[in-house]
Amino acid sequence: MSLMVVSMACVGFFLLEGPWPHVGGQDKPFLSAWPGTVVSEGQHVTLQCRSRLGFNEFSLSKEDGMPVPELYNRIFRNSFLMGPVTPAHAGTYRCCSSHPHSPTGWSAPSNPVVIMVTGVHRKPSLLAHPGPLVKSGETVILQCWSDVRFERFLLHREGITEDPLRLVGQLHDAGSQVNYSMGPMTPALAGTYRCFGSVTHLPYELSAPSDPLDIVVVGLYGKPSLSAQPGPTVQAGENVTLSCSSRSLFDIYHLSREAEAGELRLTAVLRVNGTFQANFPLGPVTHGGNYRCFGSFRALPHAWSDPSDPLPVSVTGNSRHLHVLIGTSVVIIPFAILLFFLLHRWCANKKNAVVMDQEPAGNRTVNREDSDEQDPQEVTYAQLNHCVFTQRKITRPSQRPKTPPTDTSV
């Protein structure tokens, strides 16, 4: 059966719905997308059509956008794996399940499911003001911005199947942005967020997702304690260990430094004194700062305790001088080794060249006895001429023979 026939059957249902009140309403199927309606270009998505009456045959139709050839002349059972998706797959889908009690043989159309394809434009940026750690009951502003002039933005939280939140972008010369105020903050609102951008004439073709932004609600549990070993004052270049502990049964501890976005995370360990503790090794330390730690549970990774009291870590010594010294050493030492190696090779090559340039033995007449007498008295001097080492044999004037050597050549 062609898609056109199935679509006409679905439309025909509405024309005949009056005489058939028992068909439709609660009998219409339910269409869902797994793992979600936001799909990266090149990935797959499963469309599943469920009927309350247990019928497992269904057809799919796409209401807008470009047609999808793989839907034509197809009757599906239970589910349909669609992909690798392209921008052509973006749009609104419905399904009709087989229905023997309907005059058309098909149920009413299902709920609409909008498939949005990401990766069509470059990604925007997502920020949180005043920051991603939000006290319970307070408000945070999520700002999505881009140098592309997007008329629409979508805000999506990972792990939920609901459609992304659609927001109207504010255009300006440098691009576009949108601000979304979220609160009062509760654990239900915390999570990992991403945003997307789109243009008006292609609303379901989205940009690549922004980098993930973790929104954390803090202040739900009692604060842990933070200490430094061997102490909060550290010599530049040395190591320090920050210990976060509590009698609460926290699974994970988080360590953060003021004015920094990132955080360190370690699993809590039960100590003999009955506390749950995590030790964060830091170093070599070059800069100080105020540190805090938080506790959380694995079941609620975005719900943290109150922060510990701030622990100021100070660094003594000239850290800048330490950096300069280390950097200079890294440059000078390899250069000195290379220079020594090249100079050694140069001298060896020069010495070989001097030996090769000596006169052949046949052109010189040397008395063996005279030569033997002169050898211990010969002195080798190294002369530096224009940074080049040459060797010369010089006979001391006081030791020169008074009579020329006898010519023994024939």
UniProtKB/Swiss-Prot annotation:
Pfam families: ig. GO terms for cellular component: plasma membrane. Changing residue 77 to W: In allele KIR3DL3*010 and allele KIR3DL3*028. Keywords: Cell membrane, Disulfide bond, Glycoprotein, Immunoglobulin domain, Membrane, Receptor, Repeat, Signal, Transmembrane, Transmembrane helix. Residues 26-322 are extracellular. The chain crosses the membrane at residues 323-343. SUPFAM superfamilies: Immunoglobulin (SSF48726). Glycans are attached at residues 179, 239, 273. It is a single-pass type I membrane protein. InterPro entries: Ig-like_dom_sf, Ig-like_fold, Ig-like_Receptors_ImmuneReg, Ig_sub, Ig_sub2, Immunoglobulin_dom. Residues 1-25 form the signal peptide. The keyword Phosphoprotein does not apply. Residues 42-97, 137-197, 237-295 form the Ig-like C2-type domain. It is found in: Cell membrane. One of its GO terms (biological process) is immune response-regulating signaling pathway. Coiled coil: none annotated. Disulfide bonds join 49-95, 144-195, 244-293. Residues 344-410 are cytoplasmic. PANTHER family: KILLER CELL IMMUNOGLOBULIN-LIKE RECEPTOR 3DL3, MHC CLASS I NK CELL RECEPTOR. Receptor on natural killer cells. May inhibit the activity of NK cells thus preventing cell lysis. Belongs to the immunoglobulin superfamily. This is Killer cell immunoglobulin-like receptor 3DL3. It comes from Homo sapiens (Human).
